[in-house]
Regions:
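Start-of-domain marker
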Residues: 1-56, 64
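A short beta-strand motif characteristic of beta-propeller blades
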Residues: 1-2, 34-41, 76-83, 117-128, ...
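Repeated scaffold domains used in trafficking and secretory/extracellular systems
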Residues: 3-12, 44-51, 86-95, 129-140, ...
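Conserved beta-strand positions in repeat-built beta-propeller and related beta-rich domains
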Residues: 11-12, 19-23, 58-63, 102-106, ...
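Structural recognition of the beta-propeller blade-terminating site
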Residues: 21, 30-31, 61, 70-71, ...
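WD40 beta-propeller blade core
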Residues: 28, 66-68, 109-111, 152-153, ...
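Hydrophobic alpha-helical segments and helix pairs
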Residues: 56-107
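A charged, solvent-exposed segment within the mature domains of Sec-exported extracytoplasmic proteins
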Residues: 85-157, 162
Length: 207
């Protein structure tokens, strides 16, 4: 695999690999031995939510204000234009194959959205500073925010419950009840109370 300029490298439950490059906005699928299975050329930058289920890959573009759904052949199967329903959506967390959480920056709200029926399930006032926001997720009525140099936990009412400095952070993932924070060379784990480092390789790069 050509990992130069790779923004993200992801793997699904069937051993396939997905490479997203910000430089040319390409999203490419490979099998386990590196054979290319498909490629999608995008017009805007997108954040890949998850590829665990390769039949339905969810991706979000802040620039385009839309959510795309991609099938196993890297074909677009659905697109939702968020600007026709909401204000400016800063970030999206796809909770599963039906629901997503979204932060509406212009209206200062946290929204739970059913993207299958395109209906709003619930919304909460969520007035926090979104400067340098890199990723977020929602689990058990807690909102986990990853910034350039900080990891924060909020209630759905915007109350700050936890904050810790962190460097070179890239993305958040939920593993069972824990929140994992992936950096360029480290992985940290938040167990609901404390943050601990569980992996570090100075000469390696986590994509």
């Amino acid at each position: 695999l050509q990992l130069k300029d790779a923004k993200e490298l992801l793997g699904d439950d069937y051993g396939n690999l997905y490479l997203y490059k910000n430089k040319d906005l390409s999203f490419t699928k490979y099998d386990s031995v590196g054979n290319q299975l498909g490629q999608l050329m995008l017009t805007f930058p997108y954040k890949i939510q998850s590829v665990n289920n390769p039949l339905n890959i969810v991706m979000f573009s802040e620039n385009a204000q839309e959510i795309k759904f991609i099938d196993q052949n890297m074909n677009e199967i659905q697109k939702i234009n968020l600007s026709s329903h909401f204000g400016f959506i800063k970030a999206v967390y796809a909770e599963d194959l039906q629901f997503a959480w979204m932060i509406d920056e212009s209206n200062k709200t946290l929204i739970q959205y059913n993207f299958r029926s395109t209906s709003k399930i619930s919304s909460f006032p969520f007035n926090i500073n979104l400067t340098s926001l890199k990723d977020f997720l929602v689990y058990n009525n807690r909102v986990y925010i990853l910034r350039e140099n900080t990891f924060e936990v909020y209630s759905t009412k915007s109350a700050l419950l936890y904050s810790a400095p962190i460097s070179n952070s890239k993305k958040l993932r939920r593993i069972n009840n824990d929140i994992w924070i992936f950096g360029s060379q480290t992985i940290d784990k938040f167990d609901g109370k404390d943050l601990s480092k569980i992996f570090e390789k100075k000469k390696k790069k986590i994509v």
